[in-house]
Each structure stands twice: as structure tokens, then as C-alpha cells.
Amino acid sequence: MTQMTVQVVTPDGIKYDHHAKFISVTTPDGEMGILPNHINVIAPLQVHEMKIRRVSEDDRVDWVAINGGIIEIKDNVVTIVADSAERDRDIDVSRAERAKLRAERDIAEAETTHDINEVQRAKVALRRALNRINVSKK
């Protein structure tokens, strides 16, 4: 069976390293499905839920919360360099819920003071928190 190596690397180290037969990521241009022997690519990534179908007898699917970064595909090695990333099993849901509430509060405060930059920053924080919450439920 043809397979590829998938690695997710953050400033804190390697967060994921397994063999897969399919992965799905989100770029600014939309969702991209990747199979073994994919053409070489480098692309930016959005905040998203990365789906990884591992090479295993039980057809296991892993989910990783990706908080921006880049993807490089070369010679059946997929490397994602992300600002931060967490596997579904490693997400602290209560921490993510607190981050969501904090971001919602920050958005409301920034909108009342018409601070556009703070609104945008808080919306990114909210998107990241929601992404982590969604991945934790997979």
C-alpha cells in the first residue's frame, strides 16, 4: 500500500508523526485533500481541523487542531509547520472554553470602543478557541 509520512511541527516540537493514506487541510484557497504521490507543494494554512486517515487495519482517523502555518508536500512526506497544533486527545476543553469566553468578551469591548485592530485580534482568538473545541469533540 502506498503511504506518506505526516509530521506536524510547532515551536514546541513534533506534535504528530505517523504514516497516512489521506489527509485534509484548509488553505486560503479552500480545502485540499492529499493522497500519496501528491505533486510537490508549499502552501499557507488557515486555522482548521486537519483530518488524517492513518495506515492501519482499523482505518483510524486522527484529528489535529492547526492554528495557522504552512504545509510542504515532497516525496511522500507531508510536513506542517504550525504556530501551534493539538491532537484531539490532548486538548484541554475547559481551557478552550475559557479562551472562547475571553475572546467573545474582548470582541464586545473592542466593538464598543471601535478598536478595529483589537476586534480582528479577538476574532482570530475566537476562531482558534472554536477550532480546538470542535476538534476535541471528534
Swiss-Prot record:
The alphabetical list of record keywords is: ATP synthesis, Cell membrane, CF(1), Hydrogen ion transport, Ion transport, Membrane, Transport
Query: What highest taxon heads this organism's lineage?
Result: Bacteria
Q: Is Membrane one of the keywords UniProt gives this record? A: yes
Localization, UniProt: Cell membrane
Q: Which GO terms describe its cellular component?
A: plasma membrane; proton-transporting ATP synthase complex
Under the heading InterPro entries, the entry gives: ATP_synth_F1_dsu/esu (IPR001469), ATP_synth_F1_dsu/esu_N (IPR020546), ATP_synth_F1_esu_C (IPR020547), ATPsynth_dsu/esu_N (IPR036771)
MF terms in GO = ATP binding; proton-transporting ATP synthase activity, rotational mechanism
The UniProt entry, under SUPFAM superfamilies, shows: Epsilon subunit of F1F0-ATP synthase N-terminal domain (SSF51344)
Listed Pfam families: ATP-synt_DE, ATP-synt_DE_N
**Membrane association type:** Peripheral membrane protein
Q: How does it assemble?
A: F-type ATPases have 2 components, CF(1) - the catalytic core - and CF(0) - the membrane proton channel. CF(1) has five subunits: alpha(3), beta(3), gamma(1), delta(1), epsilon(1). CF(0) has three main subunits: a, b and c.
- Annotated family: Belongs to the ATPase epsilon chain family.
Q: Main role? A: Produces ATP from ADP in the presence of a proton gradient across the membrane.
- What is this protein's record name? ATP synthase epsilon chain
